Structures are given as structure tokens and as C-alpha cells.
């Protein structure tokens, strides 16, 4: 008798769009501006420190919460960047990437039947983690033109079942950033409630035009109820290493670690020592990251002006949204496949970031975390649209 496979726990989930488009790009020899990974080298100092860590014997299980030397370095960086003192022992947990940290945070505090508010468009790992926790995602759309938060709509979405609110700044896919006024609105909304917060800040150092990243760590009244998530992969151009971390108050960290220890237990040990050395000895790397990517953004946007694609503003992050309505009226998922197969440039549609995409929206996401030669090759093809 055939084995009876139980019904899927994630009926709305298929293969992630990032994998789909990267595979399509490889099959058709397209320039891949879809998936958000750099195609230039990681800092040589980081490679040297990784090699040193392995040669010095840091090759066995790291402590479950993370190597002490890295947690101490993160605490020093948080104090330097945001003026916040965090306890490296009780408040910092090193994770196998930011996605693991987000999953852990949701599963640490959300119970079946509860609700999690998600601001759409949102990174596609949020909703499956919520569903696997037996909870329901309540999706509140951002302004379709500016990707600003409508705080009245967020307030209207709060119910007695609301346990968690997810925020992301700088925002993927738009690059929009929370302002100080947004943080005050957020604090007022959560004050006196049982609602907790996950703040996805993986692009924290990639901010442009003199803006300030409003980390939740700057706001004590928010920090006391928050998991703040970041990623070394985004900061040091090494997305394949999959190392991130979460900062939360001791009581929340204790619950977070209960999930973490039975999920991955610990994270790649040599990389933890390498990142600790980089934070300690080369703080200028994250301090200069915004200028590094702003130069790429400005050059790429200037080139896009010579195409029929309309670039939207990019305050932070390393993605450029483009309006393709002058090129095609195809839905975005069809347009990006056509663009990849017929024109040789891979992009990401916006619809997978939404529960209910805005009708008639014609936007695609391009990644400019690439070598100039890669971007030039893409622009040459886009100019032919």
C-alpha cells in the first residue's frame, strides 16, 4: 500500500521566487540582477581572519548563544552605532543568518490562533514562519507610491489576538526607511499593549543621502519589547556564510534561545571569530558602506534613465525598484520571465512580497550590489527594451 503523505502544512508556498529566477537566469544566460547577492569579493581581511580561525582550531561547535568574542564585539558595535548598551551574555544570540533569527523570534512568542501584523510588501520568509506557528498574518499595505506606513491602518489592524508586529527598515524590496516620526508613532501604538516587535534591520548600514538609520535599539521604549535582527552577510558581502544575530531583552532572549538550540544549535564557528576581528579592528567598513553602495546606486540610476524603465527613489538597501509600465502591461511575474528569457536580464517581481498585490502595479526589483561590469552588461540589454 502506498505511503499516505499528509496534507501540506504550507499550501500556499512553492519554491521561493529568488530560487526560481536565479535558476531561470542560469538556464538562459541572463545577467542576474534578481537575487540579492553581491558578485564582488568579500574583504580580504575577512578571508584572512576566517583562515586564521580555522588554523587556530575554531572548528568545533560554537557556544549555543554564539562565540563570546563575537557577542562582545556586537555589543561594542551597538554602543558605537546607536548609543545603546546591550548585555552580550543575556541579550545577543548569534544565528545562522537573519532568516533563522526571524523564524526563531516568531516561534518563541507566537501561539496558535494569535495574529502577527505584517507590512506589505514584505520579505517572503515572514508569512510561512507565521503559518507554521499556527498563527495568522494580518497584512497591512504600505503606500503603493512611497512605501510609507499608514499608521491609522496599522491601528485598525490591531485586535485582542495581536501578538507581534513585523517591521523592516531599510525596507526590502523598496529601500524605504522609517523616520523618527515613524518610530514615535510605533511607540505610541505599542505602549500599554502586549504586542511584541520584530525589527528586521539587515540593511542597517546601507543608507544614503545623509539619512540616519532609526534602529529600534535607539528607542528604549521599543527595545524593551523587541527582537532586533541583523546580518553579517549584507554588511560584509558574504551572503553564503549565513551568519546573523538577534538582540532582545533577557526574558525574550531566553525564549528565543529555546527555539534556536533545537533548530540549528549553533552557527559556523570560524566565521564568528572572523567577524569579531573585523568589527574590532576595521569599524570603518560598516561606517563607509553607505557611501560605497550610494556610488553604485547613483551610477545605476543614471544609466537606467537611458532606458524605458522608471527608477523609483532608493533611500537605503541595495535594491532598485523600476516601473516598467512604458515597456509592457504584463503582470509582474510574466514580465520578469519575459525579461529574463527574451532580453537576458533577471529581475524579481513584487507580487510575491504581497498577500494582495495592488491592482495594476507594474514594478520589478533589480539588485545593484554587483560589479560595474555586471551592471553595464545589464544596462546594455535594458536599453534595447
Residue ranges and their predicted role:
Residues 155, 338-347, 353-385:
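PLP-dependent enzyme catalytic core of the Aspartate aminotransferase-like
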